[in-house]
Amino acid sequence: MAAPALVEVPGANFDWLNLDTEQGMRIQAGRRGLTLDDINQMSYGVQGRDEAGTNVFSMRGAKADARSPRHARQYHDKGDVWSESAMLLYEEANQRQWSSARDIPWETIKPLPDDIEWAMCTLCTFLTQVEFIAGDLPGRFMEQVHPDHFEAQLFLGTQIMDESRHLDVFRKRCLVNGGGMVDAGFGAIGLLSVDDFTEMTALLHLFGEGFVQTLFRMGELISQNDAEKKIFRLAAQDESRHLAFGVTHLKYVMDTQPWRREELHHYLDLQEGTLGQNQQAGLTTNPMTGEALAILAGGGINKIDEGFQKLMIMRKRQVNEYMHRLEVIGLGDRRDRMGEGFKALLDPIDA
């Protein structure tokens, strides 16, 4: 469509009608509706924008006002924030929102033996802490995404909503059946010292959420009713998106900024070391949470030995799935430099 002709009206200035942006895009909505990927075309698309434009709040494809003040809050290099899956994951997140109030069959929760109830409350107390920090951290980086790469910011917004819902649903589970919150540990407070987008993605998305997702996917093993099964199933669905964003961002970093390899290894060296040394750093090394998981997996405190055997299976799965993601990213050499505690849980490489 041609730009509208300038309309002259005495006393008014309609210079803004002299459009200097690209026009003429016509799109038919598809089976999934009108998606971000559909409009990712012409000068409005992200292709070819490896470096962001001027540091002003002008959205991609729009002409910036020459008077716009500059700022220094945003990442300029696309590789610092980009994920090739950001658009798809954002659309999926919008389509798969759920409500902890309406979509969980809370009526299926019946009184449980004290050891089982308190074990579940212990686990869910820990998870409320984990999810609070997992929602807090992305918010610190949202404003640093340049408008030319806004899809990454949109995805982080959906993650904050997801983590808020997880905190909400695990807190409700603590309080709904005669139990309550238990003594709080430190949680994943080490993540709050993160100072870079890619560092956040490596430690939160790849590492932390990857390990938590493995636990959520084992929800059938530790759940006592349909409500708990659905909680873990829906939470795992959300975590899969966060994890996918992290893996595809880090892969993009390795593809476009290969000189950052040792930087990424350094982040993971620190996190693997922390998980192996700090009892509050993770689900599998926190004694209180580990014992609660063993009680749930075994079916009671009198079957805790059986539960610990199942817990070891989960630990091995966590580490091996973590290693697989590293290989997808392009960090397969991490197998040789992984901490000994982790390396001992790795499956041997097929000959």
Label every model-predicted segment.
Residues 127-135, 156-174, 202-213, 235-246, ...:
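Alpha-helical transition-metal enzyme core signature, strongest for iron centers
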Residues 134-196:
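Long, hydrophobic, well-ordered secondary-structure blocks that form the structural core
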Residues 114, 192-193, 207:
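Short helix-capping and inter-helix turn/linker motifs at the boundaries of alpha-helical repeat units
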Residues 215-276:
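Aromatic-anchored, glycine/proline-accented short structural segments
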